[in-house]
Amino acid sequence: MVKGKAKRKIYFAGGSVLSAVNKIIPKNKKKILIFCKGELYDNSETLFGYLMSHKFYEKYEIVCAVGKPQDYQKLVRKNVRFVNLAGSLKEIMTAGFIFYHGEILAIMPTKDQVSIDYWHGTPLKKINHMLEDKLGDYHYDFFTYLTAPSEMFRPIMAEAFDCKLNQVIIAGHPRNDDLFSKKDEFHKLDIVKADYNKVFAWMPTYRISHDKLIMDSSEDFVKNAGIPLFHTAESFTKLNAYMEAQNSLLLIKLHPAQNLEALAIQDMSHIKILTNAYLDQKRVRLYRLLKDTDALITDYSSVYFDYLLLDKPEAFIVEDMKEYGSHRGFVVDNPLDYMPGEIIESQEGFYKFLENCMEGRDAYKDKRREINDKVNHYKGGGNCQRLLKFAGISK
């Protein structure tokens, strides 16, 4: 995101000029652009993987705009290439089809282009235009269509991106296809899942951004890289001892936007810290990893809506819900109504959830299914296939 009113004014003025130029440049209906800005991950990684595994490169040119094209040279082949952000300008103006999951350059697609923003999750917390008082006047609607996972989220996404309702299409997130993959990702991390009784995933949302310009909680809750409840190395040492005694593993996946300067812990025998950079280095698809975990612990992160598709136990740490609500805010009036799992406000509650899972106690199956029906229109895989068909891309 371009920071500062003056810079934004220049940025969007330049975008208006480029949008005018874009109208007169011919489009290649055999070119698919996946715009990533940084790494190839999340929805874009899954969509790219689908295009490759189904050999769409035999009919289409597939271009990925990433931060460091040199990191993806092993994926290059005939009709498949990677460009940097500077090189993406030409691709945006010539591609017939564009997909992205965050921001793209401020260039409006033409009537001869299909540009789809599949964002990077189903929001519980306010995003984009909903945060105009914090983020300032900004534009997010540089697309033909924007996806939402269910009818409930159609007006929410339209408000968040300040676009028309008919631009919002109901489509499952491409990354959710990985929840139904048969591929094992644990071996890439040198983990043998069968060695453990239970494997838990803990995915806290971010409290303070990389650049420290966004802080969504109070000072008391941004210690230890925003990991809630356990704010000291000593408390994690105790937690690790508990996991070891239960012969179980805890995977803590940190949010990609989280500032990690205050991270006070590192890998332990039964606790592993995962970052986007590390998973990318190991070529691990996060959702293929998640599908084989036994339960999810999170807070306000969009991942829990997706995890509902697996019908496994979930828990929600809400120790800073009041502060988070006042700093960031939520897209629904009472977020607790949409949290189908144990509500945790203390370390004791955290341990109790682990114990319940280990002993097979699950009191929230009916509630999970109720919320899943509201937030996920599509319950299985096939999201990449449906999205490409909607865009008009076929083999």
Task: Describe the role of every protein-language-model region.
Residues 15-38:
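Nucleotide-activated donor-dependent transferases that construct or modify glycoconjugates
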Residues 61-73, 207, 235-279:
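Catalytic donor nucleotide-activated moiety binding site of glycosyltransferases and closely related
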Residues 380-395:
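C-terminal alpha-helical cap of glycosyltransferases
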Residues 32-180:
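Active-site and donor-binding regions of nucleotide-sugar-utilizing enzymes
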Residues 98-119, 123-126, 281-328:
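A donor-sugar binding/catalytic signature common to diverse glycosyltransferases
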Residues 2-18, 128, 140-227, 256, ...:
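A nucleotide-sugar donor-handling region in carbohydrate enzymes
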Residues 267-269, 300-375:
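Catalytic binding pocket for nucleotide-activated donors in carbohydrate/polymer assembly enzymes
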Residues 82-95, 256-302:
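Donor nucleotide-activated moiety binding/catalytic core segment of transferases
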